[in-house]
């Protein structure tokens, strides 16, 4: 009996190593759903919202190298969009199968018709529609190959009637090829980099996620150069651990130590980073960048020279040419300052807060201390990113996932679904904001349906905390950032999972410890301080002025209590400003 296209697709996906598809089934996807069920190797994960499926696929792809989600014609396509933007901007390989209305109805404004080429073009590296049995397998292989090779999203539109059509023999390959090329600067370029670094008395290294696989080489380079090492949020888990030269992160979520090291150096070496915040980059230094995507060179900093290369391969060639710097005064100065910064962070943890105003720093540090050495963390965009960036420590085995480039809310819980399904033996903890969790709350039902032992920690500050801070820094009294939330603990129980509410700071440690010990999903709803602020590495006069203006306007509007609470909650930042 001949196969139909849906069955042919499943065969190719199995050969590519696909274990699951995240989707909401629908009429144009039904033949694919049925083929998956009958073949038996791939699990159909019934999410409640396609956006959650795309986020989950993005998480699995970042951890394992390739994942698949799907959406049916019309609304199913539109619901995928935000999650696919996240995957594409995060440079992770995801295949999105977008089943469409029947091909005979194309261009007629048919029920649930969407133009997938137009719709997905800005969030994909490959975007095509298969119209014939001959095209279908070739396009599927091409879509998978593009996703892997270009590290992005491939979208393949497939008319619902094509899935049930008789398949034709594929005239090209059914296999997907995961390559690992060696990319290094030329000999002349390596020599130039070595000469520059050897001539520098004060060198600072800044690493992104592209340097994560080169931990040993980065540390060896820093040892020779006596160079402090800073890193991006995404690069933290791959660089921070077992690293006597690290000085933390810079950027909006970072610490003044990395900012200081980069600005006091005479040479800055950027490794595998596409760090987007130009204001935190020095401008009067020799700046050298190495990246495996040469199109990124120079778009974030005023480079002296840029080079194409994988970081590990490049440093292996570079290290023998680097001379040992016997003077470590610059390094010692930066490490001493970093120790003061870390001591300051500890002081925030010691202040646990009060009833219904629990210190979020204390909560994050408690999670860090109680979590396993190989935990996979997911963090919501917003204040959860701040607390995760500053308090979740790398071990060499931990992973940290978030929306670091796209910056979407509501990502942490869906990403935890993908992380837990693909790594059932690992502890997965989602640090969720109340705003983010509220957006896609319904997929707690997915966690329950598959009995995923995810631990959801809600930083419930009853506000859009980051937006509130952004408004106040710009001199605007916050407006419509407050949230009237449901009882998340009770809601969790209504979904059929464990739910715990915590309002007393003295009960935080026990609640988190108990939650992590439960063999099953748990939601811990912690009432954190809505007025807790996060100070960036460098606080300018305009920011202080803006905050002062906002507080004054709020007092004139009669919001004296909120102003008083903000001051009381953030007295600990005074020494940073001064």
Predicted features along the sequence, with ranges:
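N-terminal alpha/beta PP-like core and its mobile active-site loop of ThDP/TPP-dependent enzymes
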Residues: 1-326, 366, 370-373, 453-456, ...
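Phosphate/pyrophosphate-binding active-site segments
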Residues: 1-4, 134, 157, 169-170, ...
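Conserved structured core elements
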Residues: 3, 215, 259, 309-312, ...
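Active-site diphosphate/adenylate-binding microenvironment
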Residues: 6-14, 24-27, 32-39, 339-414, ...
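Active-site nucleophile and cofactor-binding loops and adjacent substrate-binding regions
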Residues: 24-26, 45-55, 69-76, 131-132, ...
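Generic detector of well-ordered alpha-helical packing
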Residues: 51, 162, 292, 379-381, ...
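Thiamine diphosphate
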Residues: 97, 105-112, 298-300, 306-308, ...
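Active-site-proximal structural scaffolding
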Residues: 222, 262, 360, 440, ...
């Amino acid at each position: 009996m001949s196969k139909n296209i849906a069955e042919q697709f499943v065969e190719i996906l199995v050969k590519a190593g696909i274990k699951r598809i995240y989707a909401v089934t629908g009429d144009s996807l039904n033949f694919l759903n049925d083929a998956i069920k009958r073949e038996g190797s791939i699990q159909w994960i019934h999410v409640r919202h396609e956006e959650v499926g795309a986020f989950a696929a993005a998480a699995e792809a970042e951890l394992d190298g390739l994942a698949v989600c799907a959406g049916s014609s019309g609304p199913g396509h539109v619901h995928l969009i935000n999650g696919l933007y996240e995957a594409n901007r995060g440079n992770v390989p995801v295949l999105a199968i977008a089943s469409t209305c029947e091909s005979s109805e194309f261009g007629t404004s048919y029920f649930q018709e969407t133009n997938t080429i137009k719709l997905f073009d800005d969030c994909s590296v490959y975007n095509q529609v298969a119209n014939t049995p001959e095209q279908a397998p070739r396009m599927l292989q091409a879509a998978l190959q593009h996703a892997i090779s270009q590290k992005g999203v491939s979208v393949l539109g497939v008319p619902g009637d094509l899935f049930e059509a008789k398949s034709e023999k594929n005239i090209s390959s059914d296999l997907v090829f995961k390559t690992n090329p060696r990319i290094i600067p030329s000999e002349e370029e390596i020599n130039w980099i070595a000469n520059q670094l050897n001539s520098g008395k004060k060198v600072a290294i800044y690493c992104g996620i592209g340097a994560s696989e080169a931990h040993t080489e980065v540390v060896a380079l820093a040892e020779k150069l006596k160079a402090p090492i800073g890193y991006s949020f995404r690069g933290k888990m791959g660089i921070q651990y077992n690293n006597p030269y690290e000085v933390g992160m810079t950027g909006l979520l970072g610490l003044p130590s990395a900012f200081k090291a980069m600005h006091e150096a005479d040479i800055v070496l950027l490794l595998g980073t596409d760090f987007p915040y130009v204001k935190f980059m020095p401008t009067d230094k020799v700046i050298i960048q190495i990246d495996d995507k040469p199109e990124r060179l120079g778009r974030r900093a005023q480079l002296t020279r840029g080079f194409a290369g994988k970081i590990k391969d490049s440093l292996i060639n570079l290290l023998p040419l680097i001379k040992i710097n016997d003077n470590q005064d610059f390094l010692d100065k930066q490490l001493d300052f970093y120790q003061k910064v870390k001591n300051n962070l500890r002081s925030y943890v010691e202040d646990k807060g009060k009833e219904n105003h629990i210190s979020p720093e204390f909560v994050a540090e408690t999670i860090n201390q109680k979590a396993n050495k190989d935990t996979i963390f997911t963090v919501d965009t917003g204040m959860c990113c701040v607390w995760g960036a500053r308090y979740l420590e790398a071990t060499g085995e931990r992973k940290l996932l978030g929306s670091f480039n796209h910056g979407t809310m509501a990502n942490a819980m869906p990403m935890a679904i993908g992380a837990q399904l693909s790594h059932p033996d690992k502890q997965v903890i989602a640090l969720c904001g109340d705003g983010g969790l509220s957006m896609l709350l319904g997929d707690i039902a997915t966690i329950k349906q598959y009995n995923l032992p995810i631990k959801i920690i809600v930083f419930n500050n009853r506000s859009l905390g980051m937006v509130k801070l952004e408004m106040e820094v710009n001199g605007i009294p916050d407006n419509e950032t407050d949230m009237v939330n449901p009882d998340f603990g009770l809601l969790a129980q209504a979904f059929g999972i464990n739910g715990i509410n915590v309002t007393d700071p003295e009960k935080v440690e026990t609640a988190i410890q108990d939650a992590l010990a439960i063999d099953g999903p748990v939601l811990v709803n912690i009432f954190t301080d809505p007025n807790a602020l996060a100070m960036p590495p460098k606080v300018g006069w305009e920011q202080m002025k803006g905050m002062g203006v906002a507080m004054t306007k709020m007092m004139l509007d009669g919001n004296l209590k909120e102003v008083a609470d903000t001051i009381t909650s953030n007295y600990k930042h005074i020494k940073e400003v001064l």
